[in-house]
Amino acid sequence: MPGETITLQVGQCGNQVGLQYWQQLATEHGIQSDGSSTPYPKDINDLQLQELNNSGSSPQSYPQQTKPNGKYRNDHPELFFTLSDSNTYTPRSILIDMEPSVIAKSTSALPMFNPRNVHLSNQGNGAANNWINGYKYGTEEEETLLNLIDREVDKCDNLSNFQLFHSVAGGTGSGVGSKMLEVISDRYGHKKLLNTFSIFPSNEDTSDVVVQPYNTILTLKRLIDYSDATFVFHNDSLNRIENILFNNNSNIQHDDNDLFLGANKLIALVSASVSNPLRFPGYMYSSMESIVSNLIPTPDLKFLTSSIAPFSTQKHNYLNEYDMLLELSNDRYKTNRVGGDTSYISMLNYLIGYNLDQREIRKGILKSQQRISFVPWVARSVLVVHGKKSPYLKNTNLEGIQVTNNTSMIDVFTKILKQFDLLIKRKAYLNRYYSSVEEENEVMEMFNESRESVKSIIDEYKACKEITYLDDDDEDDLEDGDGGGGGNGNGYNNIDDADMGI
């Protein structure tokens, strides 16, 4: 049986996205805002029940739950929620912030959150968009925060992984988030997977947070050191996707708040969809680790890009499997800006729907392989997983997301490094990060180490574009692992026929 996932949502951005994420999971599993369970809809399509009941999981694999009609239900919310004796669900989530307003809105919108899992600063004045303030606060509250985590771990029968929602550019999400990465890694080591859903700042040279490059580079150092997989979401790209949505729906009236909320929903939908094969199980993946291992061939190449379609527009209502695969590979739908010279290391497509047409999928895989450039040391594998659609969702149209590992990270990190260098060269705003000569030396050392770490990842992604990438001392270690990016070299066998229901 797949293990449970514990979620940490840290800072304003992390908690705003976290709220959308839990609302999405609750909707997919028929859980109301107070944690009570909704019966299966009376008009549920027989095809939906058949798809779920034929998902391939055995009675020994999962604790089965009974439907109102006496049949077993094959969704598994217990991987992300605890179920109380009174049959109410509570997210396996810890909410952390240094000011109360966002968490107050979250707990009001979703009373199912466990109030004992909420941690707020007594001062309530935030981190002032400063990584150091957030990191120091996390250090001071380390024991309290670890107690929250340990208590949630004790509720798990088979903990599989932790996941973190946060921003890399502010104060709390970056600073406290960085500290959480350190303490979880120190406490649980590599026994448990540690994934992050990290929101990156705008690529524009100007920002409301003038110290944004400092915060970002300090956070990246911790992501490089401690995360097992980081899903990158870029504000620029999210806003571009939302603009496409609104432009395709001329009747929708919108403002900047709509774009902001829509961006959070996109992140939440991708994050929820990644775990679809676990929550609505099939044959292909039995754990988050098995999913991640298909995407990350070496520990350093762990920054992932995603794309999503459709967006509830008329244009996308009639996409078949072939069209969906091609749309997912369209750069304009990616949550991180991808240029024309990008090379792919791995690609995993989720097609979520019913009775998928294997012929259309094979055509889509072959066409994608023709269009996409892969690094030379991997097979041109375009992996496809058939995701089961929740019977609680009224929309029965085919949906899809794509997760890839690719060299667009070179441009992302180079831009961050350039912005950092411009500030540090002028020693701009450095006085915000220390108050004494001793602190200054310590902070400058952290900056130097962080810069070197980011530069090393840029070099790693550049090196992976060469055929000689694996010709080093670590080649034997890689061959012993379960890394992705390999596959079998042809698209046909990248579909699991049993999981496709064919």
From Swiss-Prot:
Gene Ontology terms: cellular component: cytoplasm; gamma-tubulin small complex; inner plaque of spindle pole body; microtubule; outer plaque of spindle pole body
Record's subcellular location: Cytoplasm, Cytoskeleton, Microtubule organizing center, Spindle pole body
A single GO molecular function term of this UniProt record: GTP binding
Polar residues composition bias: residue spans: 51-68
Compositionally biased spans, kind Acidic residues: 473-482
Binding residue positions for GTP: 169-175
Pfam families listed in its UniProt record: Tubulin (PF00091), Tubulin_C (PF03953)
SUPFAM superfamilies named among the record's database cross-references: Tubulin C-terminal domain-like, Tubulin nucleotide-binding domain-like
Protein's GO biological process: cytoplasmic microtubule organization; microtubule nucleation by spindle pole body; mitotic spindle organization; positive regulation of cytoplasmic translation
Keywords tagged on the record: Cytoplasm, Cytoskeleton, GTP-binding, Microtubule, Nucleotide-binding
Region annotation (Disordered) ranges: 51-73, 473-502
Family: Belongs to the tubulin family.
Protein task: Tubulin is the major constituent of microtubules. The gamma chain is found at microtubule organizing centers (MTOC) such as the spindle poles or the centrosome, suggesting that it is involved in the minus-end nucleation of microtubule assembly.
Protein name: Tubulin gamma chain
Source species: Candida albicans (Yeast)
